Amino acid sequence: SLTGRKSVAHFNDWCLSVDEPVGQHFRKVMTGQAASLATGIQATAAIVPGHYASEEQVARALARLGKPAAAALIQGKLPTTKAIRSGDLGEIYATEWIDAHSGGYRAPIKRLRWKDHRNMAMRGDDVIGILQDAQTQRLQFLKTEAKSRATLTAQVLTEARAGLDKDGGLPSAHALSFISARLLDLDNLPLADAIDDALLKHAI
């Protein structure tokens, strides 16, 4: 099942959010405010560690080896290059936004925990949000493309649109299989089964 968790990114405390109509839809532009920079930094610092290591992993290191070792565990997973740090942060913000502001969708895993190397970008769909129908147990998917740039230009939007259009606009089979496998590792069998059904039975 999908169990929501309260986001601690607190975007509304440090970002200005503006909705702009686009045909029958709208786009939401969120901009960090300079006057609230300290709040944004504090909120971000609180969420970043959990995207690279599970709470259980950190707690175990803390209990067995103490604070310096637990800190070293997280430090060893954080990217050291500016480009990868920026890209990872885009995925982290996207995940947190989905959980808090997407109208019921949830990102069921924090996929940065499974990076091959801290200074390598992960391949595949950036973030997949999932909404499960309480009656039918069928899933709806929110495919996400996270871009990290200094300025939101038309070119950035074009690149993001191209990423979203891959696989016919649907989540890739690889991305869904990856999520399903990780959910099995986490003993979330019902959601893993529902994803496998969507992929193999319903052919989304």
Model-assigned labels for residue ranges:
Residues 101-120:
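A short acidic/basic microdomain associated with nuclease active sites
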Residues 98, 127-129, 142-148:
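Conserved catalytic cores of phosphodiester-cleaving nucleases, focusing on short active-site segments
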Residues 1-66, 72-81:
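Nuclease-adjacent, charged terminal/linker segments that flank catalytic cores
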Residues 74-95, 112-117:
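A short, highly charged nucleic-acid-interacting micro-segment common to nuclease
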Residues 133-139:
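Short, solvent-exposed loop/turn segments that connect beta-strands within catalytic domains
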Residues 94-102:
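Buried hydrophobic packing segments
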Residues 117-129:
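Charged, often glycine-rich, active-site loop that binds/positions anionic groups
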Residues 152-204:
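Acidic, metal/cofactor-coordinating or nucleic-acid-engaging core segments within structured domains
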